[in-house]
Regions:
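N-terminal signal-anchor/start-transfer transmembrane helix
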Residues: 19-31
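Membrane-interface helix starts
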Residues: 32-41
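Transmembrane helix recognition focused on a "late"/terminal membrane span
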Residues: 2-18, 41-128
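Soluble "head" domains of membrane/secretory-pathway proteins
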Residues: 2-11, 16, 21, 36, ...
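Alpha-helical hydrophobic/aromatic positions enriched in membrane-embedded helices and signal peptides
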Residues: 26, 75, 248-249
Length: 304
């Protein structure tokens, strides 16, 4: 380190440090090279690009577009990092240290970004734009399988329709993805695995039936008795035969697509509209939970 005649301190900027700081927190590398405003613009550009990507991916139902635009987003981030590296190379070795070119300032800015700014951005994104969810089970097979990572949009204020996929949250804070089978005012029942709504059979091409075993009565379905269309002296509902029940106001009946192996509304009871937290849109990543193999054919696929 050397002092010039005008008492300014000069110190070379190292490109690898600029890159490292930029990877730690977008824009931090620019602070290191004396361009904090440029770093802030880079951070805002990346946040805006991320939000735009999420919004577009939910409205453009093309796997190719979703994957390609994601790599464009990665390119934006790489461009911000590369810009900090370029500035470090250009200004070295005659860089004049600023008052903020100190280790504790970098540490403070990193903590601010990691524990304040990024969580705030994530909260805004999950509330207004969308969030990522890992689906761990097979209740929705074949539509959604274990190991699928989904992008979920906040649920619209309008009530969900029959056949729509929804994310709902139970009293313990656990999220589930299931399909709306009946809405308020509907009369729903099941006869020999076939769902009927208002007396008419429902076309369900997404449903899988894989179990041909017996169909014993299930005591977990006793909640249905208070919603029966008419009183039944010895009501013995089972997985494949139950109802008819009337869906009350502000209630929804949700079922899993893996109909023979799904712990859904038949057993849990009805879901209230206040429990709906989102709508799954598409699979952004998929990995087999056992082998760890990436399922490339599922990435970018819409779920309906």
């Amino acid at each position: 380190m050397a002092a010039s005649s005008d008492s300014v301190t000069r110190k070379a900027r190292r490109p690898w440090i600029a890159a490292f700081l930029s990877i730690l927190a977008t824009g931090l590398g620019h602070v290191y090279v004396g361009r904090p405003r440029r770093g802030l613009l880079g951070l805002l550009a990346l946040w805006l690009a991320g939000a735009l990507w999420v919004v577009l991916s939910m409205h453009v139902h093309s796997p190719g577009f979703r994957v390609t635009s994601f790599f464009v987003l990665i390119g934006v981030w790489c461009a911000v990092v590369a810009d900090a590296v370029r500035l470090a190379r250009r200004d070295s070795p005659d860089f004049v240290l600023r008052p903020y070119n100190r280790g504790w300032v970098y540490a403070a800015l990193f903590l601010l970004a990691a524990f304040v700014l990024q969580p705030l951005y994530t909260r805004v994104m999950t509330t207004a734009v969308g969030r990522a969810v890992l689906f761990p089970g097979d209740m929705m097979r074949p539509t959604i399988v274990a190991g699928d990572y989904l992008l979920v949009s906040p649920h619209p204020r309008t009530s969900p329709m029959r056949g729509e996929l929804v994310v709902w949250r139970d009293s313990e804070g656990t999220d589930f993805i299931q399909r709306v089978a009946a809405v308020a005012g509907d009369t729903a029942e099941m006869r020999s695995k076939v769902l009927y709504v208002d007396g008419l059979p429902v076309e369900e091409p997404y449903v899988a039936h894989i179990d041909s075993a017996g169909d014993p009565a299930d005591p977990r379905m006793a909640w249905q008795e208070e919603h029966l269309v008419r009183s039944v002296a010895d009501y013995r509902p089972s997985r494949d035969n139950w109802g008819p029940i009337v869906i009350p106001r502000d209630g929804f009946l949700v079922l899993g697509d893996n109909r023979d192996n799904s712990f859904d509304g038949r057993y849990r009871g009805l879901v209230r509209s206040g429990s709906l937290v989102g709508r799954p849109v598409w699979i952004y990543f998929s990995r087999h939970p056992g082998s760890g193999e990436i399922r490339w054919d599922r990435i970018g696929r819409s779920v309906r």
